[in-house]
Regions:
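HIT superfamily nucleotide-processing domains
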Residues: 1-92
Length: 92
């Protein structure tokens, strides 16, 4: 499979991992657009959020809270963004 996220999760491409569990993998963006810019991706391959099942959606949502607390932004605030498709600015 030629998916950059799958390769990062498999360790084929190095990353700065900040969190991992059974369902998700979180790592720092290589071109951050904010002081804390972390990508949280499901370990199961999917093209975008529209392919996400309920279990994975819960796991990603729980990881958002864990990473926000870990990175020290849970009180000050943060954004959660999902880009879907060309018109939604999805680049991967």
């Amino acid at each position: 499979m030629d998916c950059i996220f799958c390769k990062i999760i498999a360790g084929e491409i190095p990353s700065d991992k900040v969190y991992e569990d059974e369902h998700v993998f979180a790592f720092r963006d290589i071109n951050p657009q904010a002081p804390v810019h972390v990508l949280i991706v499901p370990k199961k391959h999917m093209r975008n959020i529209l392919e996400c099942d309920a279990q994975t959606a819960v796991a990603v949502t729980e990881a958002v809270g864990k990473v926000a607390r870990q990175e020290g932004v849970s009180v000050s605030g943060f954004r959660v963004v999902t880009n879907c498709g060309r018109d939604g600015a999805q680049s991967v």
